[in-house]
Amino acid sequence: MDISVVIPLLNEKDSLKELSDSISDVMKSYNFSYEIIFIDDGSSDQSWNTIEELSSKSNLVKGIKFQRNYGKSQALHAGFLKSQGKVVFTMDADLQDDPKEIPAMYDMIMNDNFDLVSGWKKKRLDSIIFKNIPSKIFNFAARITSGIRLNDFNCGLKAFKKDVVKSINVYGEMHRYIPVLAKNEGYKKIGEKIVNHRARKYGNTKFGPSRFLYGFLDLLTIWFISSFGKRPMHLFGSLGLILISTGFLFAAYLGYDKI
């Protein structure tokens, strides 16, 4: 299979059929073999019913249903486990990501031998206060802390070699910095492509003021995993050595003081 498209979602029933149809149109135009994997992250609307209906009409559309909201990272991880394509795409379900970008990004993976290609929403059609400004700050700091020269870490539209998504463990809020996880697993050829970003057509954004807090916590996590990767004990071991040494010196001082 050429391509798997992994799409996490929460309460996006109105956009799913249109998204599925537009992806299928692109795939058929380029004769790609493909699958579309929707992961319903505990939606309270009719999203799952729509996924079941789409799946009943085409065995190329598959669905995973969470009984409650676990978060985007867990949804992506479940989709990665199920994916079979040589190239795995991630895409948001709100129709802001354009499926027409898929062929060029696929070519970058297969012919230019990138491990990962991240979309760059250079011209964003989002709230300036709640998305644009926080994203610019976050991306600047993420470049500094991770050493990865991306302009848009958090773009939902990404393409991966299959081996990459099978090697990383995405949990918590780590969906925001999958490129850092990939780099720490040895996948260092990371590319970027300017992509078309469209205005949200249905519903409202799921982001709010808490994005600022999450962004700050994300930066701490990026610094940690970029600095220590799979070797967190290097940090804790160093701290432990400092504490033990301090305790030893203090005990020696007390012992000397009693002599």
Language model regions located:
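Short, well-formed alpha-helical segments that are part of the catalytic scaffolds
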Residues: E12-M27
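A conserved acidic beta->alpha catalytic loop
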Residues: D40-N49, L95-Q96
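Hydrophobic helical membrane-anchoring modules
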Residues: Y177-I259
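Acidic helix N-cap motif at the loop->helix transition within catalytic regions
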Residues: D14-E18, D45-L54
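Acceptor/aglycone-binding surface of glycosyltransferases and processive sugar-polymer synthases
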Residues: E53, K62-R68, K72-K82, V87, ...
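Short beta-strand/loop segment that forms part of the nucleotide-sugar
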Residues: F32-S43, I64-K65
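Cell-envelope/extracellular polymer assembly enzymes that use nucleotide-activated donors
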Residues: D2-S4, E35
